[in-house]
Amino acid sequence: EFVYEQKTEPHRVDLAIFLNGIPVAMIELKKRTAGQSAGVEGMRQYRTTRNPKEKVFGFDRRTLFYLVMDEFEAFVATRLDGKETKFLPVNRGTAEGGAGNPIEAGKHPTHHVWDELLERDMLLRIIRDYLFIDDEGKMIFPRYHQLDAVLKLERDVRERGVGGRYLVWHSA
C-alpha cells in the first residue's frame, strides 16, 4: 500500500512502483469474485477519489501511468482528469477474438500484466522506448497487442536478419 495525504487526510493506493524514489506507476487491485470489477469500481475510484492536483498524480511530473485490474481484465490511464479520465484496456484478447484475456490453467487471466508488462526489464523498456507525449500533449502508453507485435517483429529480425517483409494485422 502506498499512503499519501490529501489535505491532511491519508489516502491509499494498493500498489505503487517507484524508480529511484520516483513513483512511475500506481495500481489499484479489485476482486471480481468479491463484487468489485476493474472496469467499474476501479475506474470510478481513480476518477472520483484521486485528485489530479496532488503532486503524486500530476500529469508529466510524477506518476506515468495508472493501472486498474481484477482477476480478468486490466486497464491503463496515463493522465488523471477527474471524471474525464480515459482508460484503455491492457488485455490480450481471447482465442475467439473477443475482448478480455484467455483462460490459462493455473494462472489468472491478467497474469501477463505481472509476468510481462511489469517485469523489471520490460517496465524500464516501456518507460524508455514506448511512453511519449504526442503533439496534442497526451501521454501514449502502448496497448498490449501493439507492444506484442513490435516485440515479435524485433525477435524475428534478430533471428532472420533485416530485409524481411511483414504485415502486422491487429485490432483492439
Question: What is each stretch, according to the model?
Answer:
Residues 1-172:
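ATP-dependent helicase/translocase motor core
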